[in-house]
């Protein structure tokens, strides 16, 4: 709607911040065609995006920022993704994502007919059914607001369920406390979209935030910080976390380092189920690939990973299967190796009419 408003006003200078985050591939292509026509008619268009393929497709010139400073401006026709990445990060990186073959078999979680509502009684998830396997990265795609946030928060036990079941070894875990869930064998980690509001305590340092996952493990009535401080130093080295100190409030860290702290805390708890919501949103290329590598490490250990993402190119490389949501419904579950971005885009708009069919059944 905001994009249409600007086009209607015949703006001469148009600034777009991540304009394709809520668009399907087909809609993105249409938008780019419109922007090219605006450029040809004398308009100036500035696009802020983290998707290098979009930068190379639509722009004439590229300005690269690093740590709040402009480091270069280059002609798009004279550069490529590797050169841009090197300018962004300050060193050479490899733009490839591994997809290791899982050595594990069997389901970890089975979700059946999951239905949830918001405070106004509007359904946010509608009859969602799927399984999460051991040693699998299951991607969840869809335009923004299609139920991704509600799905991961419901599985994590943060939202009430109107109907349905979440089964672990045939036992329904809906309504069980975290302690009860742990007793039946599930070690679940959740990396939420809101890193500082829900994932970490912004005013606390790294060591204290790590204690939030471990404060009950001590042998005395008092909180023992020694292990948390040791783990903090380990994660700083392993994940290359940039922080003045382990007691520095995490709100003073960059977005990438905040995410590394949260990711490190969750994977160090040795989960067998890991839920991530937009794990690399706002991160630089280098930090993003660190996240992908760590997710693959967990996959190799047999962890089932639910990966909610917005970059379809990454999901096609990283994930084993991709589940597509549209208006809270599953419109398809596909093998990432055998599907194209365009086919996923059609599922994101429910082009095959599954939502309509389901509504008729309701």
What label would you give each PLM region?
Residues 1-362:
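Glycine-rich phosphate-binding loops of nucleotide-dependent enzymes
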